[in-house]
Structure formats: structure tokens, C-alpha cells
UniProtKB/Swiss-Prot annotation:
One of its GO terms (molecular function) is endochitinase activity. InterPro entries: Cts1-like, Glyco_hydro18_cat, Glyco_hydro_18_chit_AS, Glycoside_hydrolase_SF, Glycosyl_Hydrlase18_Chitinase. It comes from Cicer arietinum (Chickpea). Residues 1-22 form the signal peptide. It catalyses: Random endo-hydrolysis of N-acetyl-beta-D-glucosaminide (1->4)-beta-linkages in chitin and chitodextrins. Keywords: Carbohydrate metabolism, Chitin degradation, Disulfide bond, Glycosidase, Hydrolase, Polysaccharide degradation, Secreted, Signal. GO terms for cellular component: extracellular region. Residues 24-293 form the GH18 domain. This is Acidic endochitinase. GO terms for biological process: chitin catabolic process; polysaccharide catabolic process. This protein functions as a defense against chitin containing fungal pathogens. It is found in: Secreted, Extracellular space. PROSITE patterns: GH18_1, GH18_2. Its EC number is 3.2.1.14.
Amino acid sequence: MEKCFNIIPSLLLISLLIKSSNAAGIAVYWGQNGNEGSLQDACNTNNYQFVNIAFLSTFGNGQNPQINLAGHCDPSTNGCTKFSPEIQACQAKGIKVLLSLGGGAGSYSLNSAEEATTLANYLWNNFLGGTSTSRPLGDAVLDGIDFDIESGGQHYDELAKALNGFSQQKVYLSAAPQCPYPDAHLDSAIQTGLFDYVWVQFYNNPQCQYSNGNINNLVNAWNQWTSSQAKQVFLGVPASDAAAPSGGLIPADVLTSQVLPAIKTSPKYGGVMIWDRFNDAQSGYSNAIKGSV
């Protein structure tokens, strides 16, 4: 009989652990404004569960891959290795730190399956669990790779498969498609079912973003995204009007009182993604919403 009584708390513990591991969170992009503070500053807010370092903006088409962290550091002089201890400090707090590929203004493409494999090996050896004498962010081992691909679109499914194939480390994969479904650049990659997190950009796209009190277009697009192969879907929002020139800012009170209640019923709801750390630090957006995410 004693064993029977012990089963119930054990099951409760397992249930709590599962719920905790799938708990919703906030993701943020850091790296595109030298005035946004350090990476560790962002993590020390305790507002974020994911930080995407933006961006590896040059790769493919015979180019040497290169990160561009705006005014934070000069990669050509190994100046970005200073962030290694900050990455490790973030990870020690339980925050997943990923490297984001692409962006809105990069020089990147994948012209063949071979280029996809070559890039995967480069990422593994220079940012993930492999080894290299020239790791741009130092010895810190990142948790995964984010795909913010806003031009081209071929062979990113093969890149995802190659990154997923490194058995020595779980490589978390995330993607940041635009909200019109399916995404013009990342659809084939997302349909592999390999992406742990898909933070959809519900801004700069009038047909599927919040506008003038109307959440219907956003919710309709959200329902399309949650029917995709994504494991978890996040609502991507700008932290201010300045962060989204073509619109989509959802006032924090509207997000918490109207939008989140409408989308959190989905079992694929993962949380909220914020673009970006600089604008969030200025507006206090994550402070205003974190209790409701």
C-alpha cells in the first residue's frame, strides 16, 4: 500500500516538470544597436528566456561567413570574443542563447545543398559544440541557431537537417518568418518539423498584424501558424513604433487583455518574441507584459 501512496506525488512532480519545461517565455533579439547595453545587461533583467544574437549576416555564395553586431564589436579584430563570458552568464541563468542568421539587410544565400552542409559545419565548429581556432564569440557554446531569413529561401531545409544531425549536442532551431502564411523564404525549412521555436513576425505586414483595435487578422494568421509543423509558436511583436516602420505595435494593455487571451488557448503557444532589445529597453515593453505571457 505504501508504494501506491508514493505514486501520486511522483506523478504530480513529473507533471510539474513537464509543465515547467514547456512554460511560456519571452524571446528578444540583441546585437543591432550599440546603445542597447551589453548582452549580460539584457539577461540580468530576468525578462527573457531566449536571446537571439543578431546577426550572422554574411554567408553563402562563396563568401566567408561573418557576424555583424552593429556597434558592439569589430569581428575582424576578434573584438566580439569578449561576449563569451556574458553568454555563459546568461546560460547559467537558464536563458537559451542562439545565433541568428540573416536579417533584413545582410548579404546571404545558399546556392546548393553542399553550401548548406558547409555552413552547418562552420556553425558547429565556430559557435556550437565543435572546435575552431577562430571562434568569433569565443569559447562559449551557443544553444542553437535562429533562421531570420528575409531573402532567398532555397536549401534552408537542408541546413536545418544538417544542424539537427550533430548528435554530440542538442542544437535548438528557431525561425522568424513573416506572418503571411506560408512564409516566402522559410516554408520548406519549417515544414521539416525540426524547429523547436517559431517566432512569427506579426508586424510590418498589414494583412496579418494588429491595427487600430482590430485583432482579427492577427488571430486568423496565428491559427494558420499553429497548424504548421512548428513545435512551438511565439507571437512576434515590436517593442515600439520605431521598431516597426510599417506598423504592428500592440499596446501592452491590449496585448495582455485581448491578444494573449485569444492565442494562449493553443497547445503550441510558446510565448512572445520582441524586436528588439534596444527598443524594449527604451519602452519597457517586456516589463509591462512579462506577468501575462
